[in-house]
UniProtKB/Swiss-Prot annotation:
Belongs to the bacterial ribosomal protein bS16 family. The gene is rpsP. It comes from the Bacteria. Pfam families: Ribosomal_S16. Transmembrane segments: none annotated. GO terms for cellular component: cytoplasm; small ribosomal subunit. InterPro entries: Ribosomal_bS16, Ribosomal_bS16_dom_sf. This is Small ribosomal subunit protein bS16. SUPFAM superfamilies: Ribosomal protein S16. GO terms for biological process: translation. PANTHER family: 30S RIBOSOMAL PROTEIN S16, SMALL RIBOSOMAL SUBUNIT PROTEIN BS16M. One of its GO terms (molecular function) is structural constituent of ribosome.
């Protein structure tokens, strides 16, 4: 299973994170498929490549709870839900 999750960077007590797409079996700071964003909890800075995130979710990637909460602060989960709903409607119309 492919997950969108956080990869920890930085030194002790000064963590920052990359938002990455990785295999669920890979270690937290191990190999990843693609980096799609960055998050700094100290300055609350969050950068996300929205197109890449939406594309990975369309392809079946699952969000971890922390990444889902970060997406929710950016209102990105609403965009994702609308894209997924429109695809379901299009698939139903195509099957008719």
């Amino acid at each position: 299973m492919v997950k969108i999750r956080l990869k920890r960077l930085g030194s002790k007590f000064n963590a920052c994170y990359k938002i990455v797409v990785a295999d669920a079996r890979a270690p937290r700071d191990g190999r990843f498929i693609e980096a799609i964003g960055e998050y700094n909890p100290h300055s609350k800075a969050l950068r996300i490549n929205e197109e890449a995130a939406i594309q990975w979710i369309k392809n079946g990637a699952q969000l971890t709870q922390t990444v889902y909460n970060l997406f929710k602060t950016q209102k990105l989960n609403e965009k994702i839900n609308s894209v997924l709903k429109s695809e379901k409607v299009a698939a139903k119309q195509a099957s008719k």
